[in-house]
Amino acid sequence: PVKWEVASDDRFKTIVATGEATARPELGHSVHVEVTGLQPDRPYWYRFALGSDQSTRGRARTLPLASASPARLKFGVAGCQNYEDGLFTAFRHLANEDDLAFVYHYGDFIYEYKQRGPDYDKDGLPVDQVRHHVGLDCYDLADYRLRYAQYLSDYDLQAARARHSWFPTFDDHEVQNNWVSDNDGRDQSP
């Protein structure tokens, strides 16, 4: 089992919740933990351990009470991040923002297809991608898991995700470009 801890301080001197969860292969060896009893509108720190291996420390901020009326709410916004189009240095800047309540990610966390040729700059000259997707297009669960793992291997993205609570939503590329209902626009559905 994976052990987890939540603390009220970044050095884990005051542990406020602990537990264990099983990382199942059918769920991509991931765990989902719901922690109760936390105070509203404040940061907490968390970490995971499996045997002697320990995760990077993360920070999450709880929401204000539903009845609260905060005088100010500052949050980050991100989306449409194509791994092949550039480095994720903007996420490092987001990670360095200390006073964000959360990050809202409006979708296109991944791009499910591989670029087939060069992009073009403003003068119409070909420009190679900065880095390349592993594999081709995503068609099955294994393809999508590999693509997410590749995106999540970026250190700047890891830093931003460890620093702030995230509220993501989906757009088309999490499924397929321009996907609408039964009209998938490709020969094989994801």
Residue ranges: model-predicted function:
Residues 1-190:
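Metal-dependent phosphoester/phosphodiester hydrolase catalytic core
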